Each structure stands twice: as structure tokens, then as C-alpha cells.
Amino acid sequence: MKTKIVLAALSVIILLGACKKIDELLTFTVNDQTEIVIESSAPFSLPVEIPTPDITTNSDEEFSNNGTRSDLVKEVYLSNLVLSIKSPEDKTFSFLKSIHIYIRTNDSDEVELAYKDNVNSDAKFINLDLTHERLDKYIKADSYKLRTEVTTRETLTQDVTIVVDMSFKVTADPL
């Protein structure tokens, strides 16, 4: 009787371990990066849109490198979005009151990607709060566009260049 219980428990442990391993094989991260520039002419304490260039995805290659294809992708979520100040070197995020970043493609509606309100940071980088929107159609597209809206808490004396690092968690079926 004890042998049967031990075998049953061992089988459950092996099965759970195998499921976790399969899930790991089907989940991977796609990283994208872009830069935005907040110009010194930006008005103080009013929301301002910051232009961003289109971001070309390398999704077909990324999917292929991870043993899948675009049509096998089940879901994509933003797992991390970090902003870091590139220049000026001595600048921190103390000038920033709030930031909201939106994503869209030519064929898809715009959705909010991440945000941070009441920014209170003397650091050179900040993690934004994520909206947990499903982003499959944006990452599968050839390119997507970000729209950034910022509100500053002080007047800027020089342009501030910010690097936007994004990590997307992709879950897909294998080939």
C-alpha cells in the first residue's frame, strides 16, 4: 500500500515537472528598444506628446529562433518597461511628473502600454507600471508605433534623451 502511495506521489511530481518544462520551452522574451527626446521647449506642468519613430519588429526571426512561427503565437504581454536617461549624464527623473506610453500599428487600435503617475525619483532609471494588455497583434506586425505623453514638474534647460527598454513575454506553440 505504501509503495502505491509513493509511486502515485512520484508520478504527480514528475508530471508537474514535465508540464513546467514544456511551458518553459513555449515561453520566451522579445526585447525592443527605442529612444525619446523631451525637448527643453516642452511646457511646464502640461501634458505633451513626444514623437517616436516606428519600431521595426524582428518578430518572424525572433519566433523562428525560438522554434515557432507568428501564426502559432498564443499571447504576448509586456513583462517589463524601463526608462533610463541617456543624456544629459547628470540628469535624473526628478523633472518628470507623469508619463504614459501607448502602442499602435497601422491596422490596430491604440492601447496604453505602461505608465507612471506622480513620479518621485532622483534615479537615472524608472520602471513603469504595466497595463497587462494583450499585445499579440502589435508584436506580430512588421512595425509598431509608440506615443508618449509626458508632464514635467519643472522647466527643462536642455533636451533630455530617454532610452525605452521593453521586454515582451511570448507564449506560443512549437513548430
Model-predicted segments: where are they?
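Sec-dependent signal peptide recognition
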Residues: 2-9
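C-terminal motif of bacterial Sec signal peptides marking the signal peptidase cleavage site
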Residues: 15-18
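Bacterial signal peptide processing site
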Residues: 20-23
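Post-signal-peptide N-terminal segment of Sec-exported extracytoplasmic proteins
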Residues: 39-74
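A short beta-strand element within beta-rich, extracytoplasmic domains
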Residues: 75-90
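Short coil-to-beta strand junction motifs in C2/discoidin
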Residues: 76, 92-99
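Beta-strand-rich interaction/scaffold domains
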Residues: 97-129, 133-137
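Cysteine-clustered segments with highest specificity for TGF-beta superfamily mature ligands
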Residues: 123-165
